[in-house]
Curated annotation (Swiss-Prot):
CC cofactor note: Binds 1 zinc ion per subunit.
E.C. no: 3.4.24.-
Protein name: Zinc metalloproteinase-disintegrin-like VAP2A
Domain Disintegrin: 401-487
Pfam families attached to this UniProt entry: ADAM_CR, Disintegrin, Pep_M12B_propep, Reprolysin
Signal peptide interval: 1-20
Binding site for Ca(2+) 1: E201, D285, C388, N391
Binding-site list for Ca(2+) 3: D467, P468, E470, D482, V483
Subunit-level organization: Monomer or heterodimer of VAP2A and VAP2B; non-covalently linked.
Family designation: Belongs to the venom metalloproteinase (M12B) family. P-III subfamily. P-IIIc sub-subfamily.
Amino acid sequence: MIQVLLVTICLAAFPYQGSSIILESGNVNDYEIVYPRKVTALPKGAVQPKYEDAMQYELKVNGEPVVLHLEKNKQLFSKDYSETHYSPDGREITTYPLVEDHCYYHGRIENDADSTASISACNGLKGHFKLQGEMYLIEPLKLSDSEAHAVYKYENVEKEDEAPKMCGVTQNWKSYEPIKKASQLVVTAEHQKYNPFRFVELVLVVDKAMVTKNNGDLDKIKTRMYELANTVNDIYRYMYIHVALVGLEIWSNEDKITVKPEADYTLNAFGEWRKTDLLTRKKHDNAQLLTAIDLDRVIGLAYVGSMCHPKRSTGIIQDYSPINLVVAVIMAHEMGHNLGINHDRGYCSCGDYACIMRPEISPEPSTFFSNCSYFDCWDFITNHNPECIVNEPLGTDIISPPVCGNELLEVGEECDCGTPENCQNECCDAATCKLKSGSQCGHGDCCEQCKFSKSGTECRASMSECDPAEHCTGQSSECPADVFHKNGQPCLDNYGYNGNCPIMYHQCYDLFGADVYEAEDSCFERNQKGNYYGYCRKENGNKIPCAPEDVKCGRLYCKDNSPGQNNSCKMFYSNEDEHKGMVLPGTKCADGKVCSNGHCVDVATAY
């Protein structure tokens, strides 16, 4: 059973009206002083752990008593979490810290359904909580009285520069303007059933300018990165995505790329470094670079719809503010682009709050994604299937003892539907994480009304001729593993590849819409140029022209017959995403041949 501590925070309001104080977050002109006093409720003689799994804090805010519930974020670090920095002579130093007993928590305010909290309890209480729609920050005061803390609103932190701060992404990944029904999107239980949690394994990279900004204090940098990751993890829980920190790399001696104010240049260089260096020594899904360099006119930039891509599953973030919440929201925004989320359009809504995916930072940083963001994200996940984020960590991989109520099925649990207040699973006893009497299951695509679905019930639909449907066995709540026909099997006058049937007509449709078809063979001869758009593959950064027999394995060309168009050799090219618009692997390029690594090869030898 989780041992809960009750800590009473007594508020003593010092005379501060008209005064200000300099905190880590900046100059604050209106604040309260609070004194946390810990009152344990552990059994007599019990050994108190350094950082409890769950805690409650009772305090007064604006004269009203509130109870803050906190639970240790057990999904913050992966089992194989590592940290890398460099000696003055450039030697790589990688360690694997013990992070089981960490001090980072998520939480909520009792009787406030819209409340959130992200708190570090390492040295006092530091972080933020939302109460009755308003964001409060809390941090220890550096006074001789070590128990003194300041509580204040974000709006009371003086801003050095009031000019709007923008994200550098200027184009949507896809146009969803016709789909304004997204503004009425409702997340149903059935929708959730077929959209389980995804898991993003994140590496944070800190540049040399950040090290200099922090006077070379690597421990200070690490603490800040943990706090940022804790908040990003909390934000994405509401998108059914777990973000786990699997690695931290600090460029302590020198930058491994040239970090320039030009965001496009820096993002491209960082992506190439991730592909050729970081991925070869650290398994992960996504990498974000934090820099203290002032980026020209923007505070962040990322590739859109690129999660799991070796180069483009990346973003860059300017360390724009000393307030962790602000930088964490920027990071969540840029990672959102990687997950296919566009900037919010005029009809998107977060209720009464600002939205994370606004093109510019809102006057108060938001922790909410809009209905459009949810639609964009899950449209990308469903239709483009970024496979790297599907792998759910096994219960035995969880680095800390299991915690009932964290919505993650762990060793010894039959189900986990969250806290008793939030559980909506009629099959699961939220207090014990055991199935209720008479229930066979509490989750899974083959679980209906707490019973195993009948044998033969379809649980995963066929996506193409190469991907047969899966059916329930009648003996398990889980749908059998997704299998597909062997690569190279005939389908739609083409050949199957990883469960899909990649024909050029479909690829043209995805790029340009209806009434667009595969172009004549003569158009593909342009791929022999080896110029910025016409090539077959890249080697060491150089674009390699197609050999005559390989021209249909380079840039895709389409014939546009849509109204008002008469383009017989239409192609797509973007500096931000050079790979988009290339013929997909496995596409038929001649009778009995398919595209593989920019070559048109015999289907019998391709797989």
